[in-house]
């Protein structure tokens, strides 16, 4: 059984370790099989592309590469600090992701 990724698409995260330590960005994609996330503006790599209708000249394009999920920490919308994730049950039985520091919800209510 594979581990669950503690962040979701759209979360604002802080990179906690590595070359990009201290950078803040929004999660563009989550790759659960690789236990990785793609964060906007972080871990940019240059990729060679062939000529196509989208890139008529071809050449090199900068794009985000995946980071291991353990390197990022979600930023709590309530207290504004990077935090670990706890699971919490609401009165109606739903399970949500909660901030380990203040107990506020990390899940956006729809």
Curated annotation (Swiss-Prot):
<dbReference type="InterPro" id="IPR003256">
    <property type="entry name" value="Ribosomal_uL24"/>
</dbReference>
<protein>
    <recommendedName>
        <fullName>Large ribosomal subunit protein uL24</fullName>
    </recommendedName>
</protein>
<dbReference type="Pfam" id="PF00467">
    <property type="entry name" value="KOW"/>
</dbReference>
<comment type="function">
    <text>One of two assembly initiator proteins, it binds directly to the 5'-end of the 23S rRNA, where it nucleates assembly of the 50S subunit.</text>
</comment>
<comment type="similarity">
    <text>Belongs to the universal ribosomal protein uL24 family.</text>
</comment>
<keyword id="KW-0694">RNA-binding</keyword>
<keyword id="KW-0687">Ribonucleoprotein</keyword>
<dbReference type="Pfam" id="PF17136">
    <property type="entry name" value="ribosomal_L24"/>
</dbReference>
<dbReference type="GO" id="GO:0019843">
    <property type="term" value="F:rRNA binding"/>
</dbReference>
<dbReference type="GO" id="GO:0005840">
    <property type="term" value="C:ribosome"/>
</dbReference>
<dbReference type="InterPro" id="IPR014722">
    <property type="entry name" value="Rib_uL2_dom2"/>
</dbReference>
<comment type="function">
    <text>One of the proteins that surrounds the polypeptide exit tunnel on the outside of the subunit.</text>
</comment>
<dbReference type="GO" id="GO:0006412">
    <property type="term" value="P:translation"/>
</dbReference>
<dbReference type="InterPro" id="IPR005825">
    <property type="entry name" value="Ribosomal_uL24_CS"/>
</dbReference>
<dbReference type="InterPro" id="IPR005824">
    <property type="entry name" value="KOW"/>
</dbReference>
<dbReference type="GO" id="GO:0003735">
    <property type="term" value="F:structural constituent of ribosome"/>
</dbReference>
<comment type="subunit">
    <text>Part of the 50S ribosomal subunit.</text>
</comment>
<dbReference type="GO" id="GO:1990904">
    <property type="term" value="C:ribonucleoprotein complex"/>
</dbReference>
<dbReference type="InterPro" id="IPR008991">
    <property type="entry name" value="Translation_prot_SH3-like_sf"/>
</dbReference>
<dbReference type="InterPro" id="IPR041988">
    <property type="entry name" value="Ribosomal_uL24_KOW"/>
</dbReference>
<keyword id="KW-0699">rRNA-binding</keyword>
<keyword id="KW-0689">Ribosomal protein</keyword>
